[in-house]
């Protein structure tokens, strides 16, 4: 269930858009994004009272001098274009508060223009191939609250960044930092620091000076230890330390009483740190691939937990402590050594997503059928034992939307799948299916049906009645009806074939019925007898006792 169990997600605030009902000379907002524009329409500059302009995701190559007419503009989004340089007129927008130039191949030297935007509060320069930032930006701008520099080639920050005394959020993910930017430790207004996916080997003790820090992202670095001073960041609620080199967490972290989310996946902990069980306010806990064999008894105290990732560990059974977490909505147990689930699992009445892929179940774990709120079930067995059946009782999961049962040895699917009104995704890839139940055509909510690498030769003739089905995959099946060449053309060709084949069958039935009726009218037999199929080589008449005439001899009581 990799798309549900993942590292801590976060993103900077996105400015709210309110599309105007009318466009006139007093329009305050224009959205011209996603229009394949190669230039900014000059008509935009006639709306002199514009406050917000969205031009992202186009092919714009330059900003015209006419931009200076927009004296009142506060928000300008130009991300995902082809800008290489910025015109000097951009620096005349004295009211501009939010500027997004992300995903443009901008020359860093042209960014000097930005230093004239003295009202700027938000500057986003994600993935612009920057190796350095013009120092003058940090010298001249004093109101920055958000600075986005993710996905560049930065190795350090200019010392002048300490002038940003109002900075609250800084995003430096996926750069080339090997040393933690010490300058950040004097920016006391910082609330969010994102340094994921760098090569940082240590966090300085001075991090404790940031007492207002709320979210700290340090995943995918080279941290072997953590500074005890981090416990002084008393407002810290989100901490992502996934995929580092940690073996333990400082005991002083127990003082972080506002923790709601922590990521520790991909570290060599081998056991759950005792202090984590004291963070009873935790909502999300990532412990995947940490070498765990068991959970502490006190783990049951995490009663507010909604998301728990225990995937890729060494668990031989589903810990009973989990069954006490009544608010749990997502549980990842993938890639362990679990062979059986406890009957108490049904107490997780709010569970919506359950990952069991890659375990050691000998048969389908029917304990999951008591999870009435379950919406997604992952039970593909890409390693170890293979499941040979899915029980008909699967219909008990009436809330189920997605079922992933790939990489098993299933030869058939339960008919009851057709009575699951909310089923949208059914993944049966890499099994031994020889046919689909006709009842599958009743699963009207179905949007994706993945059937690659099975033994299918035919599809149900009414499969085209699934009007919501958008994805149907049939590669690596010995298909005959429809033929492989039809299947290769996609859904539309398959639906057309099924419809035409169905019409042919209806016509054949009508012709057969007409022929039989005609034969009866002409006295060639009773209608019921004509309906009986005749076997090859068994057409000789029988006597009253049911015995056939012997060839060359008359039947008993008959004259030769």
UniProtKB/Swiss-Prot annotation:
Any Pfam family hit: LRR_8
UniProtKB keywords: Leucine-rich repeat, Repeat
Chain segments carrying region Disordered: 1-20, 529-560
Disulfide bond entries: none
Domain IQ: 504-533
LRR repeat ranges per the UniProt record: 23-47, 48-70, 72-95, 97-116, 117-140, 141-164, 166-187, 188-210, 212-233, 234-256, 258-281, 283-301, 302-325, 326-348, 350-371, 374-397, 398-422, 424-443, 444-466, 468-489
Cross-referenced PROSITE patterns: IQ (PS50096), LRR (PS51450)
UniProt-recorded name of the protein: Leucine-rich repeat and IQ domain-containing protein 4
Taxon lineage: Eukaryota, Metazoa, Chordata, Craniata, Vertebrata
CDD domains with a match to the protein in the record: IQCG (cd23766)
Biased composition (Basic residues): 533-560
The species this protein was found in: Homo sapiens
Highest taxon above the source species: Eukaryota
UniProt signal peptide: none
GO CC, alphabetical: cytoplasm
């Amino acid at each position: 269930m990799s798309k549900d169990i993942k590292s801590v997600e976060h993103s900077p605030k996105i400015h709210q858009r309110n599309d105007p009902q009318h466009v006139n000379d007093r329009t305050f907002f224009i959205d011209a994004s996603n229009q394949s524009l190669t230039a900014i329409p000059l008509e935009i500059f006639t709306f002199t009272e514009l406050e917000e302009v969205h031009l992202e995701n186009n092919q714009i190559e330059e900003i015209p001098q006419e931009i200076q007419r927009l004296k009142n503009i506060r928000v300008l989004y130009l991300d995902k274009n082809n800008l290489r340089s910025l015109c000097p007129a951009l620096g005349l927008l004295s009211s501009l508060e939010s500027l997004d130039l992300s995903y443009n191949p901008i020359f860093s030297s042209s960014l000097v223009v930005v230093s004239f935007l003295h009202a700027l509060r938000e500057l986003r320069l994600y993935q612009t191939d920057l190796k350095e930032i013009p120092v003058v930006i940090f010298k001249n701008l004093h109101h920055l609250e958000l600075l986005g520099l993710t996905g560049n080639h930065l190795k350090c920050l200019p010392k002048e960044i300490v002038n940003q005394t109002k900075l609250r959020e800084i995003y430096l993910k996926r750069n080339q930092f090997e040393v933690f930017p010490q300058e950040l430790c004097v920016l006391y207004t910082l609330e969010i620091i994102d340094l994921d996916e760098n090569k940082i080997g240590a966090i300085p003790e001075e991090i404790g000076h940031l007492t207002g820090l709320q979210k700290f992202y340090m995943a995918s670095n080279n941290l072997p230890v953590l500074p005890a001073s981090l416990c002084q960041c008393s407002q810290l609620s989100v901490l992502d330390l996934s995929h580092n080199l940690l073996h333990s967490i400082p005991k002083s972290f127990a003082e972080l009483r506002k923790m709601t989310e922590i990521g520790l996946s991909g570290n060599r902990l081998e056991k759950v740190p005792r202090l984590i069980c004291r963070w009873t306010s935790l909502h999300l806990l990532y412990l995947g691939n940490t070498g765990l064999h068991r959970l502490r008894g006190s783990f049951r105290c995490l009663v507010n937990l909604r998301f728990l990732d225990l995937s890729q560990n060494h668990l031989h059974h589903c810990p009973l402590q989990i069954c006490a977490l009544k608010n749990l909505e997502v549980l990842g147990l993938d890639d362990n050594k679990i062979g059986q689930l406890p009957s108490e699992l049904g107490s997780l009445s709010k569970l919506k997503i359950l990952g069991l892929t890659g375990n050691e179940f000998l048969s389908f774990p029917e304990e999951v059928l008591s999870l009435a709120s379950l919406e997604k079930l992952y039970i593909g067995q890409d390693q170890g034992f293979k499941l040979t059946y899915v029980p008909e009782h699967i219909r008990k999961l009436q809330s189920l939307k997605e079922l992933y049962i790939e990489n098993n040895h299933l030869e058939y699917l339960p008919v009851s799948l057709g009575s699951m009104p909310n089923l949208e995704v059914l993944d049966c890839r890499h099994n031994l299916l020889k046919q689909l139940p006709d009842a599958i055509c009743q699963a009207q909510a179905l949007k994706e049906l993945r059937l690659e690498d099975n033994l299918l030769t035919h599809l149900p003739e009414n499969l085209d009645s699934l009007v919501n089905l958008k994805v149907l995959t049939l590669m690596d099946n010995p298909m005959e009806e429809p033929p492989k060449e039809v299947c290769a053309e996609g859904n539309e060709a398959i639906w057309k074939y099924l419809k035409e084949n169905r019409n042919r069958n209806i016509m054949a039935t009508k012709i057969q019925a007409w022929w039989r009726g005609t034969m009866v009218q002409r006295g060639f037999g009773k209608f019921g007898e004509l309906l009986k199929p005749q076997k090859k080589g068994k057409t000789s008449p029988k006597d009253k006792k049911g015995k056939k005439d012997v060839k060359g001899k008359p039947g008993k009581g008959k004259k030769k």
